[in-house]
């Protein structure tokens, strides 16, 4: 079970975008995340008439490692660690380590 999932609101802990918040839009590989509005880079693209694309400078979201982000806890307004709790019926749920409350979401 992944502790950070698609749709989670996260806060960046390290790097150029430290302190910024965004929503996870996609998981790349196993430990890299694409976060909306975070880690934007400018790429120079050549025109390709076969694909119908024009050339120029485009902004692209690049993946960021999951160790550099933490799930944002709206109740405390801070980044929080995530734990896995096994319920009595055997299902596993994600909980915030600081408060023990269940993480709602996807």
From Swiss-Prot:
Keywords: Ribonucleoprotein, Ribosomal protein, RNA-binding, rRNA-binding. It comes from Verminephrobacter eiseniae (strain EF01-2). GO terms for molecular function: rRNA binding; structural constituent of ribosome. GO terms for cellular component: ribonucleoprotein complex; ribosome. PANTHER family: MITOCHONDRIAL RIBOSOMAL PROTEIN L24 (PTHR12903). HAMAP family: Ribosomal_uL24_B (MF_01326_B). GO terms for biological process: translation. CDD domains: KOW_RPL26. Part of the 50S ribosomal subunit. PROSITE patterns: RIBOSOMAL_L24. This is Large ribosomal subunit protein uL24. SUPFAM superfamilies: Translation proteins SH3-like domain. The keyword Heme does not apply. Pfam families: KOW, ribosomal_L24. One of two assembly initiator proteins, it binds directly to the 5'-end of the 23S rRNA, where it nucleates assembly of the 50S subunit. One of the proteins that surrounds the polypeptide exit tunnel on the outside of the subunit. Belongs to the universal ribosomal protein uL24 family.
